[in-house]
């Protein structure tokens, strides 16, 4: 039999080499012919030695495992325990191979996303001038952490998703369509009609997630300006916005 190696490629590890041999021999991971794979695996390691390439202990351990499975398959099955041990060893190897293949696909996808992200250009944040007057002494952000805001945002996105139709329709959104200043004025108008409003009332009116985010940021800006205060009676509960009345 001729040596099956045509050229040597760089492998990330022993599982990478095994997957290459399985694909080369047109085998399924669940139906590997150990005797064929073992011989070719050892030939790869031998060639790596000839080329003075570094062979890590992981490759050697995998080779020993393959040899052990192969040798046990050739020995007569005297005891049931030996047969069970051999099957378990091969089963564990198959499971690890399947798991490695999944991670390899995920890493390839993430690598593609990393490359495509470099081609994305984002808009600079809007600069909002904050008026110094009408400030209250109470600091409404005192007991609020970034984690609280993140959880709150996720809850709002969940509510938004429940309000939408099951069939999602792709829309093109203009970059400047939703502005924080417009949403600030929108919230001011709503609070002028009634002093206390629920934030969830505005979600069904939003066309997309971006509009929900901009509305949420407008609410934070009004809190920062001390024009409103928010009340939440429980974690992930309803957000009540109340207009702050400053005594002159």
Swiss-Prot record:
InterPro entries membership: ScpA, ScpA-like_C
GO biological process, alphabetically ordered: cell division; chromosome segregation; DNA replication
Family statement drawn from the similarity comment of this UniProt entry: Belongs to the ScpA family.
Known role: Participates in chromosomal partition during cell division. May act via the formation of a condensin-like complex containing Smc and ScpB that pull DNA away from mid-cell into both cell halves.
Quaternary organization: Component of a cohesin-like complex composed of ScpA, ScpB and the Smc homodimer, in which ScpA and ScpB bind to the head domain of Smc. The presence of the three proteins is required for the association of the complex with DNA.
Domain of life, per lineage: Bacteria
Keyword Cell inner membrane included in the entry's annotation: no
Subcellular locations according to the entry: Cytoplasm
Cellular component per GO, a single term: cytoplasm
Any coiled-coil regions, as ranges: none
Keyword Cell division: yes
Keywords (A to Z) from UniProt: Cell cycle, Cell division, Chromosome partition, Cytoplasm
Name recorded for this polypeptide: Segregation and condensation protein A
Record-linked HAMAP family: ScpA
